[in-house]
């Protein structure tokens, strides 16, 4: 799914995992999302929910990790070694800067605007770096994993 409305003005947008062993009969086996309450994301402004994913074929990540751009909840690193029970092993939410744009919603005939991070797309490389960009003009961030995410990837 993809969040398309600001401030949670739509049903929750999830990450879905599917078994496509039989290509003509795909079957959803699990889902995952960032708990809204973990960061009051609906109140932060902008979109909150799954957007783009990256499941890298590089050996460092293949069949181990997936990364999801989650708009105002930043980028999320998921351990997918058990696709029936994906779990978050890391995340990064960029800080707002003077260049970060406002996102507005109509409220009682007037626009209510908030400055909000909108992590949009991401890419990884075979060294274990994650590159994320923000659609609200905050820029690009190059990330290096730490903690549990680094352990899942098998990086020293």
Where are these regions (language model features)?
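Feature marking well-ordered beta-strand scaffolds used for ligand recognition
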Residues: 1-156
């Amino acid at each position: 799914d993809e969040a398309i409305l600001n401030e949670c003005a739509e049903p929750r947008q999830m990450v879905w995992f599917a078994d496509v062993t039989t290509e003509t009969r795909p079957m959803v086996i699990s889902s995952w999302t960032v708990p809204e309450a973990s960061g009051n994301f609906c109140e932060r402004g902008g979109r909150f929910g799954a957007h783009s994913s990256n499941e890298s074929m590089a050996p460092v990540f293949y069949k181990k990790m997936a990364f999801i751009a989650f708009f105002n909840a930043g980028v999320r690193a998921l351990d997918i070694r058990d696709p029936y029970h994906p779990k978050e092993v890391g995340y990064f939410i960029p800080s707002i800067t003077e260049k970060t744009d406002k996102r507005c919603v109509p409220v009682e005939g007037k626009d209510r605007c908030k400055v909000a991070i909108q992590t949009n797309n991401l890419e990884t490389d075979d060294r274990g770096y994650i590159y994320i960009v923000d659609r609200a003009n905050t820029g690009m961030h190059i990330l290096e994993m730490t903690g549990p995410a680094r352990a899942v990837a098998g990086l020293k």
